[in-house]
Amino acid sequence: MLSPKRTRFRKQHRGRMKGKSCRGNRICFGRYALQALEPAWITARQIEAGRRAITRYARRGGKIWVRIFPDKPVTLRPTETRMGSGKGSPEYWVAVVKPGRILYEMGGVSETVARAAISIAASKMPIRSQFIRLEI
């Protein structure tokens, strides 16, 4: 599972997901991509599930690029704990995704294979997304 090797601070504020993604919204490496249409936190488990789905479908052919990285810790308090006594401990990591952000890229395969593989990965994501291809 993806997570940072080290961070400056153990815990982070939740923050807000305003506006569109101004970075990471163009295809850079492959020919086909999965683009987010909604804002969300995508967990490291969901990213890994999508990556595995694409890899399994594409088998040996092609190359896959994961364009998001979970760098935000999400804290949870233990169940049946009273309020107070500080913030909970970090439980898992999420990537903050805004609309327009590229999640996965694919290259070296035909469009039909890429479309099918990316649609399987899209079903593993908690948001609506679209298949896009590099216009040359």
From Swiss-Prot:
Name of the protein: Large ribosomal subunit protein uL16c
Species whose genome carries this gene: Agrostis stolonifera
Subunit field text: Part of the 50S ribosomal subunit.
Segments traversing the membrane: none
UniProt GO BP: mitochondrial translation
Record's keyword terms, sorted: Chloroplast, Plastid, Ribonucleoprotein, Ribosomal protein
Gene3D superfamilies, A to Z: Ribosomal protein L10e/L16
Principal location: plastid
Superkingdom in the source lineage: Eukaryota
Entry's family note: Belongs to the universal ribosomal protein uL16 family.
One term under GO cellular component: mitochondrial large ribosomal subunit
Places the protein is found: Plastid, Chloroplast
CDD domains: Ribosomal_L16_L10e
Stretch list, region Disordered: 1-20
Disulfide linkage: none
A single GO molecular function term of this UniProt record: rRNA binding
